[in-house]
Amino acid sequence: MESLASLYKNHIATLQERTRDALARFKLDALLIHSGELFNVFLDDHPYPFKVNPQFKAWVPVTQVPNCWLLVDGVNKPKLWFYLPVDYWHNVEPLPNSFWTEDVEVIALPKADGIGSLLPAARGNIGYIGPVPERALQLGIEASNINPKGVIDYLHYYRSFKTEYELACMREAQKMAVNGHRAAEEAFRSGMSEFDINIAYLTATGHRDTDVPYSNIVALNEHAAVLHYTKLDHQAPEEMRSFLLDAGAEYNGYAADLTRTWSAKSDNDYAQLVKDVNDEQLALIATMKAGVSYVDYHIQFHQRIAKLLRKHQIITDMSEEAMVENDLTGPFMPHGIGHPLGLQVHDVAGFMQDDSGTHLAAPAKYPYLRCTRILQPGMVLTIEPGIYFIESLLAPWREGQFSKHFNWQKIEALKPFGGIRIEDNVVIHENSVENMTRDLKLA
């Protein structure tokens, strides 16, 4: 494999080209990109965990250091002021010396408020991208040039097309997450609580709770019916029935986002349903290709859900077509088939149809779908179908003309298992689709 250093060199060249184009289009001289700042908890002197500006970590794999600044103009070597205070209270990261520092000019910034004297004197035509607009105003940036929508839309649109460096980082994040999923399954099989399973996951991935790209969803039994369950019970349930794990990892700022579901027993209806959802997920991925709308794949999976509901006699005496047409599949899969993935877990530009930011909303029937793009080479997306047994979504169907088609006895028997979700991360190539997750043999 080509070295990360050479891939990064090409990555920077791509970002420089995008920056030149954006600056020319919006008549700016340069962009000042801020890593961000620490913010204290209200009425406290303790800060919230630091989360870096994603537009900053697109350029440099510096994810844990606030008060850093990048100046980029698309022509000259990017200039990074790296926060390096004299501080005996807190850990201070050393000045970087890594595979990427040949391609960026790295300068120590000993005081957070010292950046003003180091920037070009003429700042009226510099754009600021960052989370602290008041800091930009203090530096003399024009208010109209603070997080300018046109520039951000342009950069966001092209972030959809990953460079080879970005794909290499995402494959490394996959490896970490796969290690975590294997450790978590083992912890589940040994009877651990959600809290302890989460610890096993973090240990295997080498992450802290604040390092993972999103809060791990570690859901035993009926908790799997809560789509974003993050409570983490300390006590294991008396009976282990099911385990849904939605958990990722991060490498150089790039995310993995995987989900697996396991049945405690291999010989019940739920275990067969898990297997069937997994098979249908793989079958859908096998059909994916560039040039097709992501929305089409979402709709196609509702047809596959209908097939499973019929096979398992959860819905009876109704055709699969009628199930989808009348949205009987909706309460069983209330979320979208997936989303773009990259520097952010729910990566940007899922609805953008061009580099001017033209927005195409999700279909009214499927409002929680997070992407309406035509798939193109370089895109990375999740494919994460599920079937759930959520009473608040099923309740409206207990009355009315379609109620008789629901096998309520079967649904009640499956509700204690919560639900099922299977999620892989795929890369769209010109003539193929790469499944980064399955390539690592995660069943």
From Swiss-Prot:
UniProt-listed Enzyme Commission number(s): 3.4.13.9
PROSITE patterns associated with the record: PROLINE_PEPTIDASE
Required co-factors: Mn(2+)
Domain of life: Bacteria
BP GO annotations: proteolysis
Reactions mediated catalytically: Xaa-L-Pro dipeptide + H2O = an L-alpha-amino acid + L-proline
Residues given in the record as Mn(2+) 2 binding sites: 246, 257, 423
GO cellular component, one term: cytosol
Cofactor remark from the record: Binds 2 manganese ions per subunit.
Residues involved in Mn(2+) 1 binding: 257, 339, 384, 423
A GO term, aspect molecular function: proline dipeptidase activity
EC class: hydrolase
SUPFAM superfamilies attached to this UniProt entry: Creatinase/aminopeptidase
A Pfam family assignment: Peptidase_M24
Keyword line: Dipeptidase, Hydrolase, Manganese, Metal-binding, Metalloprotease, Protease
Function summary: Splits dipeptides with a prolyl residue in the C-terminal position.
Similarity annotation: Belongs to the peptidase M24B family. Bacterial-type prolidase subfamily.
UniProt protein name: Xaa-Pro dipeptidase
Encoding gene per record: pepQ
